[in-house]
Amino acid sequence: MTSSPVSRVVYNGKRPASNTRSPSSNEIFTPAHEENVRFIYEAWQCVERDLRNQVSGMDRGVVEEYVEKNPSNSLKSFKPIDLNDLKRRTVQDPKKS
């Protein structure tokens, strides 16, 4: 069985030339979808800029970690997962889905 490489999301606002799609693509993005993607991209760029400035000593206290003061009892057993790993396992073994 040949496994194809896992695709990665690129947030630089540009698509690689090898990833261009033909006009007959079934995927249609609405203006609202494109606006949401643009908003998330721009917001993330601001976070990354603030984090870089904070690390380099230019700004202090701009980016901070949110910690719940009163954690929910239902989340005590929550264990974070690596979504890339989950996708990789799903792609490698499609019979289990």
Curated annotation (Swiss-Prot):
The keyword Ribonucleoprotein does not apply. One of its GO terms (biological process) is regulation of epithelial to mesenchymal transition. Coiled coil: none annotated. Residues 82-97 have a biased composition (Basic and acidic residues). Keywords: Cytoplasm, Nucleus. Residues 17-28 have a biased composition (Polar residues). May play a role in the regulation of the epithelial-mesenchymal transition. Belongs to the MCRIP family. This is Mapk-regulated corepressor-interacting protein 1. The lineage of its organism: Eukaryota, Metazoa, Chordata, Craniata, Vertebrata.
